[in-house]
């Protein structure tokens, strides 16, 4: 089952920041949430795997929601009030993670989708045959 996040990774010097950036990377296998200040220094991070989900359960929307709540718990303790959200990747947990961020009470200045899209660059991998 899901274990509570008692050990959330925090930098040793607890800097008070009023504004930050929340990066949500949603792949097909996992969802990783990284919270940085405006200069890019990591304040906290969490993922579905670090929140206690294993194997195929890491890719579920519920796992992304729990990972976002675990990462945002540090922000609320540090007093962050405003954040920007950068969504990346095609995973199933991106909308649920965004919903958890909105419900946390942090004021969002904007939400941006920064998923890299090729302009017909490299050849795509072959289709799966099951």
From Swiss-Prot:
Its main location: plastid. It comes from the Eukaryota. Keywords: Chloroplast, Plastid, Ribonucleoprotein, Ribosomal protein, RNA-binding, rRNA-binding. Transmembrane segments: none annotated. It holds the Pfam family Ribosomal_S11. GO terms for cellular component: chloroplast; ribonucleoprotein complex; ribosome. GO terms for biological process: translation. The keyword Acyltransferase does not apply. One of its GO terms (molecular function) is structural constituent of ribosome. It is found in: Plastid, Chloroplast. NCBIfam families: PRK05309.1, uS11_bact. Belongs to the universal ribosomal protein uS11 family. PANTHER family: 40S RIBOSOMAL PROTEIN S14/30S RIBOSOMAL PROTEIN S11 (PTHR11759). Part of the 30S ribosomal subunit. This is Small ribosomal subunit protein uS11c.
